[in-house]
């Protein structure tokens, strides 16, 4: 426990919180260029081939980013937008690629949760009476 004099001289230091997505440098999104597209297997007890991409961000950092949704159009040298967000069963993957931004198309035929997958709203034909 500090003395009163120590508190007057130095004060109390507030603890700094560690960020979960340090490569974004406090930005909500960062653009980058896709270097490699690959599939990885998740931790136990899950089983799948999850799609991830290695991305070089605009601040020269290289990160692994998850590609959400079914089917994707991500290729090498594509410009991508990266947001934070961990994938629970993939160690070392702390970022997501935003679908429907830059060179990446949204998921086709998506009807629910469209904004998460960059899917456009289906046009409804209007009939006149």
UniProtKB/Swiss-Prot annotation:
Part of the 30S ribosomal subunit. Contacts proteins S8 and S17. May interact with IF1 in the 30S initiation complex. PANTHER family: 30S RIBOSOMAL PROTEIN S12 FAMILY MEMBER. Keywords: Methylation, Ribonucleoprotein, Ribosomal protein, RNA-binding, rRNA-binding, tRNA-binding. One of its GO terms (cellular component) is small ribosomal subunit. InterPro entries: NA-bd_OB-fold (IPR012340), Ribosomal_uS12 (IPR006032), Ribosomal_uS12_bac (IPR005679). Belongs to the universal ribosomal protein uS12 family. Residues 1-25, 110-129 are annotated as: Disordered. It holds the Pfam family Ribosom_S12_S23. One of its GO terms (biological process) is translation. GO terms for molecular function: rRNA binding; structural constituent of ribosome; tRNA binding. Residues 10-20 have a biased composition (Basic residues). Disulfide bonds: none annotated. This is Small ribosomal subunit protein uS12. With S4 and S5 plays an important role in translational accuracy. Interacts with and stabilizes bases of the 16S rRNA that are involved in tRNA selection in the A site and with the mRNA backbone. Located at the interface of the 30S and 50S subunits, it traverses the body of the 30S subunit contacting proteins on the other side and probably holding the rRNA structure together. The combined cluster of proteins S8, S12 and S17 appears to hold together the shoulder and platform of the 30S subunit. The modification 3-methylthioaspartic acid is found at residue 89.
């Amino acid at each position: 426990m500090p003395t009163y004099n120590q508190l007057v001289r130095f004060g109390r230091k507030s603890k700094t919180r560690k960020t979960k997505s340090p490569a974004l440098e406090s930005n909500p999104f960062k653009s980058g260029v896709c270097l490699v597209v690959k599939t990885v297997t998740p931790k136990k007890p899950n089983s799948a081939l999850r799609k991830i991409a290695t991305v070089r961000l605009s601040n020269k950092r290289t990160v692994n980013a998850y590609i959400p949704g079914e089917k994707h159009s991500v290729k090498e040298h594509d410009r991508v937008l990266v947001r934070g967000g961990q994938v629970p069963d993939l160690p070392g993957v702390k970022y997501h690629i935003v679908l429907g931004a830059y060179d990446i198309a949204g998921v086709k035929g998506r009807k629910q949760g469209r904004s998460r997958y960059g899917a456009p709203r289906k046009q409804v034909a209007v009939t006149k009476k």
